[in-house]
């Protein structure tokens, strides 16, 4: 005969999210004591998590949030797409975004040792282990990033494919342009620029592109070669530089012209301060 009630079993499952069999085991081992059973399952989760650490994690989700605390983005990976869409896993990821915002964290290893937003009695790493036990798969926090909150900035976040790709755009100069920033983030997910502007293209990337172009037009007069290189570089910049790209919602204008228009209308100097594009596994 069990030494615990069905109500205690139900409470343990609600508190931990662990399966019925393991909850019964925990309560049996702890003589029906709910608090001790929770501790038992946490220890069990840490032990079982270490056995899963070697498993590949190619699926996952990217989540981001911006509020008065700043802006945070995280990528968390699991083994299967099924678990990537699991409610318990998604809740862990959402809580992790809160952890980054609360702790202003920008380093995964440091964040793992800090108290979790979802359960202050656990570190982020301990909660990760408990969640691994619940979903039955390895969970890896691949990367995080935190942007401090500053005045006169607008932040736009766009998520695509249920968190498979997420872009963040930060505009400086105005604090009421979240809608524009989000539209630019949507453009970024679709157009996938590599750099902000022509000036931000690294010298080695530019040299490599010139080398590729030159190899395709050998045997022509130098003046012709220079003209062709100039034209092809213009196309290259339009492909890889955000400000040079045709705006996806209005291809007749570029992102730079779009920003210039907002600056002119508002009387403020508006610029794309920063953007990022994260894709699962990229």
UniProtKB/Swiss-Prot annotation:
InterPro entries attached to this UniProt entry: EF-Ts_dimer_sf, Transl_elong_EFTs/EF1B, Transl_elong_EFTs/EF1B_dimer, Transl_elong_Ts_CS, UBA-like_sf
Keyword field: Cytoplasm, Elongation factor, Protein biosynthesis
Sequence segments annotated as region (Involved in Mg(2+) ion dislocation from EF-Tu): 80-83
UniProt GO MF annotations: translation elongation factor activity
Location(s) in or outside the cell: Cytoplasm
Pfam families: EF_TS (PF00889)
Key word Iron present: no
Main location: cytoplasm
One Gene Ontology term, aspect cellular component: cytoplasm
Keyword Transmembrane: no
NCBIfam families in UniProt: tsf
Record family assignment: Belongs to the EF-Ts family.
Role summary: Associates with the EF-Tu.GDP complex and induces the exchange of GDP to GTP. It remains bound to the aminoacyl-tRNA.EF-Tu.GTP complex up to the GTP hydrolysis stage on the ribosome.
Protein name: Elongation factor Ts
Lineage: Bacteria, Pseudomonadati, Chlamydiota, Chlamydiia, Chlamydiales
Gene: tsf
């Amino acid at each position: 005969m069990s030494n615990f009630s069905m109500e205690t079993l139900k409470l343990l499952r609600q508190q931990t999210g662990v399966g019925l069999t393991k909850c019964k085991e925990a309560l049996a081992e702890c003589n029906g004591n709910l608090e001790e059973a929770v501790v038992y399952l946490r220890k069990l989760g840490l032990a079982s998590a270490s056995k899963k650490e070697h498993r590949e994690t190619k699926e996952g989700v990217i989540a981001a949030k911006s509020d008065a605390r700043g802006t945070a983005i995280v990528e968390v990976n699991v083994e299967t797409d099924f678990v990537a869409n699991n409610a318990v896993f998604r809740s862990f990821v959402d809580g992790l975004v809160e952890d980054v915002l609360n702790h202003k964290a920008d380093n995964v290893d440091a964040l793992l040792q800090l108290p979790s937003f979802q359960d202050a009695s656990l570190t982020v790493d301990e909660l990760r282990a408990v969640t691994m036990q619940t979903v039955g798969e390895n969970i890896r926090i691949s990367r995080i990033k935190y942007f401090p909150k500053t005045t006169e900035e607008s932040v736009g976040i766009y998520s695509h494919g249920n968190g498979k790709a997420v872009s963040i755009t930060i505009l400086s100069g105005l604090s009421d342009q979240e809608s524009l920033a989000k539209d630019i983030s949507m453009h970024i997910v679709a157009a996938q620029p590599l750099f902000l502007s022509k000036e931000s293209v690294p010298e080695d990337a530019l040299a490599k592109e010139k080398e590729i172009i030159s190899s395709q037009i050998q045997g022509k007069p130098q003046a012709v070669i220079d003209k062709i290189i100039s034209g092809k570089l213009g196309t290259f910049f339009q492909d890889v530089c955000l400000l040079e790209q045709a705006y996806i919602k209005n291809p007749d204008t570029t992102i730079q012209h779009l920003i210039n228009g907002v600056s002119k209308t508002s009387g403020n100097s508006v610029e794309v301060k920063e953007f990022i594009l994260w894709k699962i596994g990229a």
